[in-house]
């Protein structure tokens, strides 16, 4: 049995990878690996499944795979939001369903970017000239961080270098990182309100964990809470940081045993 998690919308065995030119055929991969059955899921479905223990007891997961960024008063009978920037912006939710859970496999990274201040409006205008529609993941992602830095400084740097500058205290690097993380706060709050999340929010993906040293004073949580009449609602939600480098693999393994995802298993 093989579970494959790929970065693109899954509607069949062939998937176009969102942020590069690759095409992926799960049936051909399964045949090449000589397996009799496979399950194909979105990569952030796998990330979300790695945090199912926040809704149901599961002793198979390590106890140190998350850090608490902000405590709260969770209601575990409601959806859990899992969101995170990497090469794109992944968004998924886990919903309690009897003695199991369902995964809402959304494309929330492609909602329209909503600036909240003049600096963000400048970034939006800069990208709109090139792209037309500017989705959230054009800003809240590794490539998004590069776009922010270029717009603010006129210089091109890869995202790891910008992150390293920020961690070293470089003013320009910090400014770019803070804008990206505050924008993540906006998108995460919008998603939490849309899903009716009360179980909490898990921030995953490869970018946030590498910037964990500056998360506390980045303004991310303050921006997350800054939603007018629903501030008390959002302030009640615990926020976690996923620090498990194997989260995707653990979640993919768990997907095979999930009652609802297992219905999509294809026999070769």
Language model region names:
Residues 11, 38-72, 159-178, 186:
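ATP-dependent carbohydrate kinase catalytic cores
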Residues 3-7, 41, 81-88, 92, ...:
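Short beta-strand segments
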Residues 118-268:
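ATP-binding/phosphotransfer module of carbohydrate and carboxylate kinases, centering on a glycine-rich
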Residues 1-40, 45, 49-58, 208-213:
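Short beta-strand-loop/turn "lid" adjacent to the catalytic site in phosphate-handling enzymes
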Residues 34-36, 76-80, 197-198, 236-237:
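Short coil/turn connectors at secondary-structure junctions
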Residues 64-67, 76-135, 212-213, 220-225, ...:
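Glycine-rich phosphate-binding loop of actin/hexokinase-like ATP-binding domains
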Residues 17-20, 39-46, 71-73, 82-84, ...:
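Active-site nucleophile and cofactor-binding loops and adjacent substrate-binding regions
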